[in-house]
Swiss-Prot record:
There is a cross-link at residues 653-689 (Lysine tyrosylquinone (Lys-Tyr)). Specifically inhibited by a mouse monoclonal antibody AB0023, inhibition occurs in a non-competitive manner. This is Lysyl oxidase homolog 2. PANTHER family: LYSYL OXIDASE HOMOLOG 2, LYSYL OXIDASE-LIKE-RELATED. Its EC number is 1.4.3.13. Mediates the post-translational oxidative deamination of lysine residues on target proteins leading to the formation of deaminated lysine (allysine). Acts as a transcription corepressor and specifically mediates deamination of trimethylated 'Lys-4' of histone H3 (H3K4me3), a specific tag for epigenetic transcriptional activation. Shows no activity against histone H3 when it is trimethylated on 'Lys-9' (H3K9me3) or 'Lys-27' (H3K27me3) or when 'Lys-4' is monomethylated (H3K4me1) or dimethylated (H3K4me2). Contains 1 lysine tyrosylquinone. Disulfide bonds join 84-148, 97-158, 128-138, 218-291, 231-301, 265-275, 351-414, 364-424, 395-405, 464-530, 477-543, 511-521, 573-625, 579-695, 657-673, 663-685, 732-746. Component of some chromatin repressor complex. Interacts with SNAI1. Interacts with TAF10. Interacts with HSPA5. Interacts with EFEMP2. Glycans are attached at residues 288, 455, 644. The modification 2',4',5'-topaquinone is found at residue 689. Ca(2+) binds at residues 549-550, 722, 724, 727-728.
Length: 774
């Protein structure tokens, strides 16, 4: 056996989530599901509220991480109050979410998880069947009858999907001061031809949807702060001035339809639904509203560098720091990932205590994206490594960088299970409409079909499957908003795609993995060459919302390294598996020996799904010497390099058996090599290749004394998808004097700033590893 089992009168805010979904042409967060391209759903007719039921308004308040969640607050009898969590159920949560215009509730939370509210606790012991038109129709102890405290305030998490055609009840709107924005949808409509032709749309009228009608907003009370919020929602970090004269000319040509109200934002809101309702343009919203001495409100947004239609963006210097101080890691899509901050030359994570939309939006804008769509907690985008630099971050929303916010530098009580992440709003680039999956068993898989221009016409066709790999598949899944790639298929004869797309129109695709679109990858252009040809060899993908993330424990490598002079007669299995250098063939089998650089490697899965071998069990290889199956021919590379990067020796470990050696906390082991067991590494577990197992070495018999780099690369050929490939390389400085070896400064690539990386060759913390004679 080779292995060792390795969260009074209150007249503020008022409710409603505004823009959970935007039209497909304006916003690119839609899943590429077939149902999104079917006929529009019929208009929703809200159930009648019985005449004897009190009229109320609801809102979601508190420390929110998404605009569609928060503490449930009820406006009744001239006051805002809360709801107690006693006897609250998912049925009551459904009623709340539907009253707010969402399709359903995803969950509900107890014990003031969004912070304690103020004012009366209006409802206690609420019982709903789930079919009620309003929370006021559910049974309860009665208005204000409760024995609860605000530590028991209930919250809900609503689905972001809106009820089609939902109309808000504005009957109480004039009786509530500081009411929040209440509209079904919002958009930026390009007016000038120059902007209509651009992608993304960066300038135009701000329009809101009421029923089936899009209406303009009067600019009489419009401010730059309003523009900042709107631009942020559409994926832009900032706003700028525009030519008012040309818009006056356009407004004079056509009669406008104005929304009866105005907006009042502070500029720090992540979502327009958090802005307050501004002064009314007309006291009688029923009549045709005019904008006296005014024009339709216009926004002109500044895109980040990645999304600029004219090359490098000209946005303010604040968005272009000379050295990035924050980065995102482990996200499937552009503008999302675990937040990592550079401090004292080392990258570290952010603890999710007090992490909310305001702080997350500061990160997003700093990186050239819009406001935050979601502040993610609980290491849902994978665990980081290294220090936790920031804790209990509290931003006002006006900061240029996350490091300008108030925070606690102490990370006591935090661990990497609490790493904070963000999902930012990004501009609609239209990439999703140029790619589709067909023939799969579910919307996450299928044959890849691309839209290309041929002879002046747009046609759909296949992608040649030759040399198609997981990196190319990752770009496809990202472009479609379907997460990570779990598989890349070079043959898709078993999937029946669109019969009108059976011709190969793209070949020679080679991606780096960072592209926003498959069209951005290198390919043959119109000179399509697919040797195998035919429908059989069209490229395909399977996508997944989660992925594993393997990271090597650098400290264990450094601590376990030593030299061993091992006799040739003890290396018969190693010879069979080609684990020795070529010169071993000339070594005397009885008296000769090989000098081996031995070490242990502990490989952790810090991702959000299990790491499974690329090949199925039918393709595993039996190794008689080790008496078990190996599931991956190439899992890691072990290399000794000159300081100029030239390889002088390499590990020749032929293949690997993957299993769970140990796991964190109460996580159960799922994989083992023995008895033809399933192989892989469970999330939260690690696989330990001990220094004393066969082939766990680099044969340095022919290496002269000197200074070297020792490098370990996990999953070097990208055979299995991971959420982050940047942490797959570990490097150590190595000094070998012919008898002893020193291994020091072992670290994972990308853990330090570029400046610090350049200094890591300085001799410090040396470990003296003597030669071990056997």
């Amino acid at each position: 056996m080779e292995r060792r089992g390795s969260s009074c009168l209150c007249r503020c805010l008022a409710l409603l989530a505004l823009l959970p979904t935007l039209s497909l042409a304006q916003y690119e967060s839609w899943r590429h599901y077939p149902e999104y391209f079917q006929e529009p759903a019929p208009e929703y007719h809200r159930p009648e509220v019985p005449s004897d039921v009190a009229k109320i308004q609801l809102r979601l308040a508190g420390q929110k991480r998404k605009h569609s969640e928060g503490r449930v607050e009820v406006y009744y009898d001239g006051q805002w109050g809360t709801v107690c969590d006693d006897d609250f159920t998912i049925h009551a949560a459904h009623v709340v979410c539907r009253e707010l215009g969402y399709v359903e509730a995803k969950s509900w939370t107890a014990s003031s998880s969004y912070g304690k509210g103020e004012g009366p606790i209006w409802l206690d012991n609420v019982y709903c069947t789930g079919s009620e038109a309003t929370l006021a129709a559910c049974s309860s102890n009665g208005w204000g009858v409760t024995d609860c405290k605000h530590t028991e305030d209930v919250g809900v998490v609503c689905s972001e999907k809106r009820i089609p055609g939902f109309k808000f009840d504005n009957s109480l709107i004039n009786s509530i001061e500081n009411m929040n924005i209440q509209v079904e949808d919002i958009r930026i409509r390009a007016i000038l031809s120059a902007f209509r032709k651009r992608t993304p749309v960066t300038e135009g009228y701000v329009e809101v949807k009421e029923g089936k009608t899009w209406k303009q907003i009067c600019d009489k009370h419009w401010t730059a702060k309003n523009s900042r919020v709107v631009c942020g929602m559409f994926g832009f970090p900032g706003e700028k001035t525009y030519n008012t004269k040309v818009y006056k000319m356009f407004a004079a040509r056509k009669k406008q339809r104005y929304w009866p109200y105005s907006m009042d934002c502070t500029g720090t809101e992540a979502h327009i639904s958090s802005c307050k309702l501004g002064p009314q343009v007309s006291l009688d919203p029923v009549k045709n509203v005019t904008c006296e001495n005014g024009l339709p409100a216009v926004v002109s947004c500044v895109p980040g560098q990645v999304f600029s239609p004219d090359g490098p963006s000209r946005f303010r210097k604040a968005y272009k720091p000379e050295q990035p101080l924050v980065r995102l890691r482990g996200g499937a899509n552009v503008g999302e990932g675990r937040v990592e901050v550079l401090k004292n030359g080392e990258w570290g994570t952010v603890c999710d205590d007090k992490w909310d939309l305001v702080s997350a939006s500061v990160v997003c804008r700093e990186l050239g994206f819009g406001s935050a769509k979601e502040a993610i907690t609980g290491s849902r985008l994978g665990q980081g490594i290294g220090p936790i630099h920031l804790n209990e971050i509290e931003c006002t929303g006006n900061e240029k960088s996350i490091i300008d916010c108030k925070f606690n530098a102490e990370s006591q009580g935090c661990n990497h299970e609490e790493d904070a992440a963000v999902r930012c709003n990004i501009p609609a680039m239209g990439f999703q409409k140029k790619l589709r999956l067909n023939g799969g068993r579910n919307p996450y898989e299928g044959r890849v079909e691309v839209l290309v221009e041929r002879n002046g016409s747009l046609v759909w066709g296949m992608v040649c499957g030759e040399n198609w790999g997981i990196v190319e598949a990752m770009v496809v899944c990202r472009q479609l908003g379907l997460g990570f790639a779990s598989n890349a298929f070079q043959e898709t004869w078993y999937w029946h795609g669109n019969i009108n797309a059976n011709k190969v129109v793209m070949s020679g695709v080679k991606c780096s993995g960072t592209e926003l679109s498959l069209a951005h990858c290198r390919h043959d252009g119109e000179d399509v060459a697919c040797p195998e040809g035919g429908v059989r060899y069209g490229a395909g993908v399977a996508c997944s919302e989660t992925a594993p993330d393997l990271v090597l424990n650098a400290e264990i490598v450094q601590q376990s390294t030593y030299l061993e002079d091992r006799p040739m007669f003890m290396l018969q299995c190693a010879m069979e598996e080609n684990c020795l250098s070529a010169s071993a063939a000339q070594t005397n089998p009885t008296t000769g020996y090989r000098r081996l650089l031995r070490f242990s490697s502990q490989i952790h899965n810090n991702g959000q799904s299990d790491f499974r071998p690329k090949n199925g069990r039918h393709a595993w290889i039996w190794h008689d010497c080790h008496r078990h199956y190996h599931s991956m021919e190439v899992f890691t590379h072990y290399d000794l390099l000159n300081l100029n990067g030239t390889k002088v020796a390499e590990g020749h470990k032929a293949s690997f058996c993957l299993e769970d050696t140990e796991c964190e906390g109460d996580i159960q082991k799922s994989y083992e090599c023995a008895n033809f067991g399933e192989q892989g590494i469970t999330m939260g577990c690690w696989d330990m290749y001990r220094h004393d197992i066969d082939c766990q070495w680099v044969d340095i018999t022919d290496v002269p004394p000197g200074d070297y780099l020792f490098q370990v690369v996990i999953n070097p050929n990208y055979e299995v998808a991971e959420s982050d490939y940047t942490n797959n390389i570990m490097k150590c400085r190595t000094r070998y004097d012919g008898h002893r070896i020193w291994m020091y400064n072992c670290h994972i690539g990308g853990s330090f700033s570029e400046e610090t990386e350049k200094k890591f060759e300085h001799f410090s913390g040396l470990i003296n590893n003597q030669v071990s004679k056997r």
